[in-house]
Amino acid sequence: MLFTKAISALLCGALLAGCTGAPNKQPAASRSFRIVGYVTAAAVLDVIDFSRLTHVNYAFLLPKKSGELKTFGSPTQLRRVVEIAHATNVKVLISVGGWGWDDEFEELAAAEDRRARFVRAVVDFVAEYQLDGADIDWEYPDAGASSEHFVALMRELRAALPAGSLLTTAVVSDATHADGIDPVIFEIVDFVNVMAYDGGPANHSPLSLAEQALSSWDAKGLRKEQRVLGVPFYARPGDISYRKLFESDPATADGDRILYFSKEQNYNGPATLRAKVALAKEEASGIMIWELSQDALGADSLLKVIWEASQ
């Protein structure tokens, strides 16, 4: 059913593709279809078209087991992101954690005093950099006490953030493997980024994985308006950016597979991303991208493909 809906929407969108021009001047935050892009300190900001986004997640702010935050290494870059994004009405969130920081979250979330320290540090950071909220990327809470601590942490952070601030989180693609995510979390956050990639060593993010991911989270109780479908701007197994793949062979890079230094790499090309946008328009509320510095430049940008398909 998901596949049928996605393809039908894609065909309808194709008929209108020729009418798509410059980015919509409508304020990004008021557009109903979310386009969430992760940005890292490695990004060259001048080549990213922020007007094609609704939200930017700046990655990463790192936690300590004590509940304190590690020294932030790119303050100038983040301030520049906020300046550029806010000029086009794009929201900016700080993403806290990321892969490999599970032990820190487990420890800090397990005690009320450490949670309070973490919450205050994040709220102060949001205020200092004039951010629009926080994205908590705990990969991943386990079932039982860990899950309960995650709920407590998110509830306390939500209560401490200023009114109108955004609070989001990221989850694994398959909800049946996410026992540590209590559905009560859905009542606390604004939306959830579903990381529908890294599903295998090779063809790691096909359309079928996206369909299965959204269906599984729907079954767990995550509402359509809170589901944001994650897509990769990189290939597996080599973790090669789409930009490098495109520069190596522009014609072949339009597909989903390419030989890169004699080794097959699998990724999402323009056609697959259009199909995923069509799927997200039916079964979710937007697209999330990991990550923007991996995109091709100018007219060959995958962000451009996503933005045009979303119109």
Please annotate each region the language model reported.
Residues 17-18:
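C-terminal motif of bacterial Sec signal peptides marking the signal peptidase cleavage site
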Residues 88, 129, 161-164, 283:
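Helix C-cap/helix->beta junction micro-motif
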Residues 27-126, 203-209, 215, 300:
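Glycan-recognition patch characteristic of GH18 chitinases/ENGases
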Residues 1-7:
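Bacterial N-terminal signal peptides that target proteins for export
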Residues 56, 94, 136, 192, ...:
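Conserved, mostly hydrophobic/aromatic
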Residues 52-54, 185-191, 283-285:
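Glycine-enriched alpha-helix->loop->beta-strand junction motifs that scaffold or abut catalytic
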Residues 36, 65-76, 120, 139-262:
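Substrate-binding surface in catalytic domains of secreted glycosidases
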Residues 233-306, 310:
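Substrate-binding cleft of secreted/luminal carbohydrate-active enzymes
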